[in-house]
A protein has these predicted regions:
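Rhodanese-like catalytic fold shared by cysteine-dependent sulfurtransferases
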Residues: 1-22, 28-61, 70-108
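Short, surface-exposed ligand- or partner-binding patches at beta-edge/loop junctions that are enriched
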Residues: 65
């Protein structure tokens, strides 16, 4: 099984692969509106249990994102317990992504 976390550098490389992993942003809608990574799908952590099985493909790679990495790691572990084997949390969240990969993404 994959490591529970993926580094920003490793995810940046994966984005260009086919099929690219789904980027799942589990932050609140106001956070997503403040700063987001292009192509991300926003399902807030609090809505995950009611939406995951209808909206996420358990066979498709998923990278989960939040602000600093705590919520995304929690959602990653929950999804794995639900049978999603190809899911990883973006280490450091969007904060680290903005610092290390794309400084045009606002920090908050």
């Amino acid at each position: 099984m994959l490591d529970p976390e993926i580094t920003a550098d490793a995810y940046a490389k994966l984005r260009s692969e086919t099929p690219a992993p789904l980027l799942l942003d589990v932050r609140e809608p106001w956070e997503y509106a403040t700063a987001s990574i292009a192509g991300a799908v926003n399902i807030p952590m609090g809505e995950m249990t009611s939406r995951a099985h209808a909206e996420l493909d358990p066979d498709h790679p998923i990278v989960v994102l939040c602000h600093h990495g705590a919520r995304s790691l929690s959602v990653t572990m929950w999804l794995r317990n639900q049978g999603y084997d190809h899911v990883q949390s973006l280490a450091g969240g969007i904060e680290h992504w903005s610092r290390a990969i794309d400084p045009t993404v606002p920090r908050y």
